[in-house]
């Protein structure tokens, strides 16, 4: 049995445990500070350094330099709380922390994350709390507090600092700077604001009286220790959630009298008989999160004002107490409008830095949310057909965008431009202009939670039959609108249903294209067609004739063949000469380098060849016969080849590939094949 325990115990990092439980004298702590002044950082400095410890990545988007902070990818938890597609709001948030870290004024403000429901506000707050907790365990994030020990007049052997105060607060403010300089500590780097909390101040005064003012003897009763922040242990990380007015009072934030200890100390004004366990005190040295902050009773807001502006709180029956913590809250639009319209809350508005956290407006980033939640490792025994999550994400993003004012631009095209796709007639400047004219995009629309709920419904539905596809999910999304509590207006429901129709049309175009490519994915046939085209283009540009391989006769270049290919990618008659010369110049440049031309390296030509081959082969495959009950053996074999290509090249399974082929076949049967 002992060997099994030893095996289990071997996973415990004893060295790390000892580092986290380090304790020493006040003199040893001064030496720690002298060597590493960063241990005395305030909460905002530590928060900023924590985020920056994960690095920063610059990139250009629509001619604008943006910064991505990998911290918000949640690398420590393998992306469990990763925030996608919100680099601009997160840049603003980090800039607030940076400004506060440098003491430029934002450290005296409440940070308010504002946005629609399900836009990652609470996730961001949770990440910051988790990040601080993890950072405090690392050598570079170390911070310290202290206990009183061996007190000559106390009932307890050890009395911790009730709010985990900074040990340098023990040096009186009046001569702290001179004392630190005398100890060889750089006071330009170590700037400790604030004084002792009421409990420690009381003990300090009693000891000073006891030792006749000899500070050196008083400080012998101090044991400095490493401080590890922990939300679960309520150390340096606090969370406050509003309740109904009858069941909450300000003591939840600022602490309350411990009536049991009054019997020990004889007075309720003795700070040792006070529980410094309000959320503000718990969060000292770290962060406090206010969930749905603007639902707080007005009485609580006065505590919030002092805590943010002065970094002080007022416990019942005691003097103001210094605190050092990041104050962050979050709220939705409805509650924020109450703040804006309430003249009694002007003081809070004035002390608030609002950061809008919108929904994602980039399709690829929205898709990542659902790909993470419904990955193959999580979803067992049910196949999610290709484009299912993409179409759900497309609908969600489209509901958040403003309709384009330009007549020739559709909502789906606008969505594609935002996603980085290039469209004829639109440049990066066009995208910049679109965004400028739609500044409120992302502040309304469908929440990712609604999409996730409906995907979950589909996965457990009897209709799934081992596979869910875009139509099944889009129909589920449509049906859910009738009872969606956040979509109350019929106008919005009608608009969202119209967008579902647009997304279905987009999906139809995608699968038609995939089936076309699967049919024309015969490498040998494509290579032959390409060689034939190049021979004719070469003869045309060099004003030569082409030798017919079968008759041996020299003939004029096959203009009909060349135009049938070029027409597939909208090369106008007036531009055909330029296009053909470009192709030949490219082939010539490759030849100089000793390389041969591969049509797959030219995306436009590759697409044109595939479409031409599809046009030539679709009648021989007779895909439209799929919707009939009788399919001859030869046709079935060809269809099976196409199906296997769909499975191999696009990620379908047997069921979803058959469904897509049936769907596209029904379109061809209607004579609606994409040209």
For every predicted segment, state its role.
Residues 1-54:
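N-terminal accessory segments that target, anchor, or regulate ATP-driven/P-loop NTPase machines
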Residues 37-675:
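Conserved ASCE/P-loop NTPase catalytic core
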